[in-house]
Regions:
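Short, surface-exposed charged micro-motifs
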Residues: 26
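Short acidic-glycine loop/turn motifs at beta-strand connectors
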Residues: 29-33, 126
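Active-site "cap" helix and flanking loop/linker of ATP-utilizing ligase/carboxylase catalytic domains
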Residues: 2-23, 40-112, 120, 125-127
Length: 137
């Protein structure tokens, strides 16, 4: 926090560009400590799929508090649940990946308690309920 996040945000403010919003830090942990590989002014993908379902406070309320500079006046609450995000990638990703291959086990996962399945790079096979690969991940 004090090595990367705070200096970045403080530096933006000193340059006359105070940041308000979501700032995602893509980090790599090295033998010399954490290194920034990217900044994004958005939520991280796929990390957000694990984080937002745990949020009890209305996200719009949080965003409005950020805009109005009153974030310190609201209480942000989270569930006590653990969260995990698993990303599946089609064979060959990120280079030449396969499309049109059936993905099995999705309905079994969706039937499990407290499990959410998010799709990206998938589609329903025409005329059926079969989910197939349509993108890299």
């Amino acid at each position: 926090m004090n090595e990367i996040f705070r200096p970045t945000v403080d530096g933006m403010a000193r340059m006359g560009r105070p940041f308000r919003g979501v700032l995602y830090f893509g980090l790599m942990i090295t033998k010399d400590g954490p290194k920034v590989i990217e900044y994004n002014a958005r939520f991280g993908d796929p990390e957000t799929q694990a984080v937002l379902p745990r949020l009890k406070t209305d996200l719009v309320e949080i965003m409005n508090a950020i805009i109005d500079e009153r974030l310190d006046q609201i209480q942000i609450e989270w569930t006590d649940h653990a969260a995990c995000c698993v990303v599946l990638a089609s064979g060959g990703y990120p280079k030449s990946y396969r499309k049109g291959h059936e993905i099995s086990g999705i309905s079994d996962a969706e039937a499990m308690e407290n499990v959410l399945v998010f799709h990206a790079g998938t589609k329903l096979r025409e005329g059926s309920d079969t989910v197939e690969t349509a993108g890299g991940r």
